[in-house]
Structures are given as structure tokens and as C-alpha cells.
Amino acid sequence: MKVTTTRFGELDIEEGKVIHMPEGMLGFVEKRFILLTPENLGPFCWLQAVDNPDLAFVVADAKNCAPGYTFALTAEECRALELSERSEAIFLLVVTMAPEPGDITVNLRGPIVLNPERLIARQIVIEGEKYTTRHPFFETSEKKQSGLQRLERQPEKSVPPAG
């Protein structure tokens, strides 16, 4: 299928690579996306709307962005994403780019949870004050040689019991 984008022009995408977000992203009506991973973007990817050439989000895998970032999915969220006990979800964070690398932030309160086997995703809103919508992407400490904070483990998910 052909997908037109304002950033990458016209792309030929396999129908089987389309990610379905039945509830869309908060504030947007689009429900079908593709994940573009250009080599020159390093840890960043583009979540491009299939039906709107102008709508794309820069995203990053949570395991590369925030140490200690954990949360549990509800049983209803696991069902909506068709996650089983053996499923491995991918947790994507929406990135706010900035001219200075030290000013790049990620939204920890609204992660996108993706079931890569079923290509179903959902944006989750984490209640409370534990996480912010503007968490620094790059390490501020000069002790880190890579400059990139790394997760020590992936966010937890709870899976409803089978039966």
C-alpha cells in the first residue's frame, strides 16, 4: 500500500506492518500508524499516521530513555492489546525534540504500549504525580560517557489469568 508523508514522501508499506490504535492518540482521530526507523535517527523512530501525511510523532523505546520507569497494565488494557502471558509489549514514549540535545524530553505519563505480534497499540495515561510529560531524554550528569540514560529493566505489565 502507498502511504504519503510530508517528511519522507511516498512510501510503499506492507499492509501487514500497519499498527492499529482503536482509540487513537490523545487528541487525534487517526487510528492507523506505521513505525518508521530511519538509520540516521539513532534511538528515535517516527510513528506516522497512515491516513494523514502531516501527522507523525517522534518516539523512542522506553528502555532507552528513563531509568527505573515502571508501571503495570490493567487486565482491561492487556485484553484490549491482546497481550498474553507470553507476549512482549514494547513501550514507546513520545519525544519532544529541541534545538539543544539537552532540552529533548519524553512523555512518561502517556506511553504508547504496542503488542508487536498483533500490531495493536494503545496510549496509556498514567495517573498521579510520579511521572512527568517532560522527562529529560539525555543524562545531565557528565559521569555518563554515552550521555544516554538506560533502563535497567522494561516496564512491568500484569497479564490477566487465562481462563
UniProtKB/Swiss-Prot annotation:
GO terms for cellular component: cytoplasm. Signal peptide: none annotated. Residues 136-163 are annotated as: Disordered. Pfam families: FliW. Keywords: Bacterial flagellum biogenesis, Chaperone, Cytoplasm, Translation regulation. It is found in: Cytoplasm. InterPro entries: Flagellar_assembly_factor_FliW (IPR003775), Flagellar_assmbl_FliW_dom_sf (IPR024046). Its main location: cytoplasm. GO terms for biological process: bacterial-type flagellum assembly; regulation of translation. Residues 136-156 have a biased composition (Basic and acidic residues). The keyword Chaperone applies. HAMAP family: FliW (MF_01185). Acts as an anti-CsrA protein, binds CsrA and prevents it from repressing translation of its target genes, one of which is flagellin. Binds to flagellin and participates in the assembly of the flagellum. Interacts with translational regulator CsrA and flagellin(s). Belongs to the FliW family. This is Flagellar assembly factor FliW.
